[in-house]
Curated annotation (Swiss-Prot):
One of its GO terms (molecular function) is structural constituent of ribosome. Pfam families: Ribosomal_L34. InterPro entries: Ribosomal_bL34 (IPR000271), Ribosomal_bL34_CS (IPR020939). Residues 30-44 have a biased composition (Basic residues). This is Large ribosomal subunit protein bL34. GO terms for cellular component: ribonucleoprotein complex; ribosome. Keywords: Ribonucleoprotein, Ribosomal protein. Residues 15-44 are annotated as: Disordered. It comes from Rickettsia rickettsii (strain Sheila Smith).
């Protein structure tokens, strides 16, 4: 059986990266929440 996690930096960036977060209103809300919480890393 194939494992579910097949790492790929390109897909990681495209799906969870900063620019993809900024592209949608909900993504910006996520970044706002993470800034408010004081996260060192905002996105992948």
């Amino acid at each position: 059986m194939k494992r579910t996690f097949q790492p790929s930096n390109l897909v990681r960036k495209r799906r969870h990266g900063f620019r993809s977060r900024m592209a949608t209103p909900t993504g910006r809300a996520i970044l706002r929440k993470r800034r408010a919480k004081g996260r060192n890393k905002l996105s992948a």
